[in-house]
Amino acid sequence: MPEVQRMTLTQFLIEQRRRYPDASGGFNGLILNVAMACKEIARAVAFGALGGLHGRAGGPDAAGAAINVQGEVQQKLDVLSNDTFLRVNEWGGYLAGMASEEMEAPYQIPAHYPRGKYLLVFDPLDGSSNIDVNVSVGSIFSVLRAPEGTADVTEQAFLQPGTAQVAAGYALYGPTTMLVLTVGNGVNGFTLDPNLGEFFLTHPDLRVPADTREFAINASNSRFWEAPIRQYVSECLAGQTGPRGKDFNMRWIASMVAEAHRILMRGGVFMYPRDTKDPARPGRLRLLYEANPIAFLMEQAGGRASTGRQALMSVAPNALHQRIGVIFGSRHEVERIERYHNEQTDPDLPNPLFNERSLFRASA
């Protein structure tokens, strides 16, 4: 293997800190602890079935399976990953509290550990339903400032808009383990060297192309889509002979981290929009620890993130596990989808997947 001099994550954080002479080392320590948690999870994921961690937590049958606060069946690796984030991050003295997809209420830092000035919110293992079929999964995290002068953090402390994030990122556990991070000054990707146990800067200054020919959406929900989404997808599927004048490819991995990573690497647009499948839910993805961190990364990389109706990071949260519609990726495509929402297109637009260019079109 050729010798290449690369900056480690620690060196990168030190360089960033030098831009702010009055900054303490606490923030760097927090990010390094998050990275350590991701290394442990990467190792557990890599062992797969050999580690005995595949399958549902609580038992193999649905009747005995563990259910999280979202009403979703927990995988064994969900539980392990959540415990790893808590254990690795609680002791450092950098945090006032944590919140996770897997826990109903905020996690209080134990009294015998020092209390810090940051909050950490995370999805410990995004895409965990893909574990048993060996599809890439990941961890998503966001760092916020904690309110001053409170002993125990409450849910309210975490209800900050995405614009208040201090840092955000994800770890992708795939053929290689990558940590993709923003501290509010661009987006950088680090690859884990499994021999040295170090993250090295391999993808500096990631940028999302403004234009794309790829989109990602779960087409099985097409009958529930609102008119602007149906219009956008219909135009993409019409290809070169349609109003867009070019062909598009459609992707869907069912792992948000993997989708976001592909878009950061080569462009694209991801849509998990609000729909009518469950009118009580304004979306599927969680605002605080899924949508906002990815939105921060996209915006810092020159892309855009939106609900379709407003900038994603401008949404004022009203609950710890609030769900929301999410659209992100190449700026020009996201702006087009926003424009379709603003124009309130025809609600009776035909479903593109079951009419023109479809195997399901009724014969005349």
UniProtKB/Swiss-Prot annotation:
Subcellular location: Cytoplasm
Source organism of this protein record: Cupriavidus taiwanensis (strain DSM 17343 / BCRC 17206 / CCUG 44338 / CIP 107171 / LMG 19424 / R1) (Ralstonia taiwanensis (strain LMG 19424))
Co-factor binding comment: Binds 2 magnesium ions per subunit.
NCBIfam families given in the database record: PRK09293.1-3, PRK09293.1-4
GO biological process, one term: sucrose biosynthetic process
Protein name (Swiss-Prot/TrEMBL): Fructose-1,6-bisphosphatase class 1 2
Broad class of the protein's primary localization: cytoplasm
Cellular component per GO, a single term: cytosol
SUPFAM superfamilies linked: Carbohydrate phosphatase
